[in-house]
UniProtKB/Swiss-Prot annotation:
This is Hypoxanthine-guanine phosphoribosyltransferase. Mg(2+) binds at residue 194. The keyword Transmembrane does not apply. Converts guanine to guanosine monophosphate, and hypoxanthine to inosine monophosphate. Transfers the 5-phosphoribosyl group from 5-phosphoribosylpyrophosphate onto the purine. Plays a central role in the generation of purine nucleotides through the purine salvage pathway. Binds 2 magnesium ions per subunit. The magnesium ions are essentially bound to the substrate and have few direct interactions with the protein. PANTHER family: HYPOXANTHINE-GUANINE PHOSPHORIBOSYLTRANSFERASE. It comes from Meriones unguiculatus.
Length: 218
């Protein structure tokens, strides 16, 4: 039986990094507490996850399913590393891509009401090996709902890669197959993670400030 890959665990008392140490867009300078995961660390970790995916799923055609919008940066970078491995190693796998868009957040809370509001026809997943790529697992309810939806199309295999998993008492206990970082129960933005559609244009994963939440509240 396949085992889930390990992750980098960021402790509850992790201080993060001062904003002044990084290039932060000026329009967000007053809206963030700190840089939590620098972009370079994200990229290095993503490269390793690509190797883990190849080891676990290599040899079979993969349909990579991107969960929009927050997952698009991680999705693009992960697939770039997989493509590099395809070019430079003896083991390669053909890949195709699909997209699905879900909505479960209002302000900084996961509503638990999961809506599929866009995406391709998922009948293309039938009989395929599917890699779902997500930005963050919070309560886990969204992913459980998506997995139930995907299973209706009878894929051959389903694996989930998430850049982040949040430690939270609200969790239903779901854990993805591939995890970049396990983080404390803080609301993070950047690297395509948003707060009411803002902050997707940050390179780093950052902790939003209370003033930032108030400024961009829906």
């Amino acid at each position: 039986m396949a085992t889930r890959s390990p992750s980098i665990v960021i402790g509850d008392d992790e201080p993060g990094y001062d904003l002044d140490l990084f290039c932060i867009p000026k329009h967000y300078a007053e809206d963030l507490e700190k840089v939590f995961i620098p972009h370079g660390l994200i990229m290095d970790r993503t490269e390793r996850l690509a190797r883990d995916v190849m080891k676990e799923m290599g040899g079979h055609h993969i349909v990579a399913l991107c969960v929009l919008k927050g997952g698009y940066k991680f999705f693009a970078d992960l697939l770039d590393y997989i493509k590099s491995l395809n070019r430079n190693t003896d083991r390669s796998i053909p890949m195709t891509v699909d997209f699905i868009r879900l909505k479960s957040y209002c302000n900084d809370q996961s509503t638990g009401d999961i809506k599929v509001i866009g995406g391709d026809d998922l009948s293309a997943l039938t009989g395929k090996n599917v890699l779902i790529v997500e930005d963050i697992i919070d309560t886990g309810k969204t992913m459980q709902t998506l997995l139930s939806l995907v299973q209706k199309y009878s894929p051959k295999m389903v694996k989930v890669a998430s850049l982040l998993v949040k430690r939270t008492p609200r969790s239903v206990g779901y854990r993805p197959d591939f995890v970049g970082f396990e983080i404390p129960d803080k609301f993070v933005v950047g690297y395509a993670l948003d707060y009411n559609e803002y902050f997707r244009d940050l390179n780093h994963v950052c902790v939003i400030s209370e003033s930032g939440k108030a400024k961009y509240k829906a």
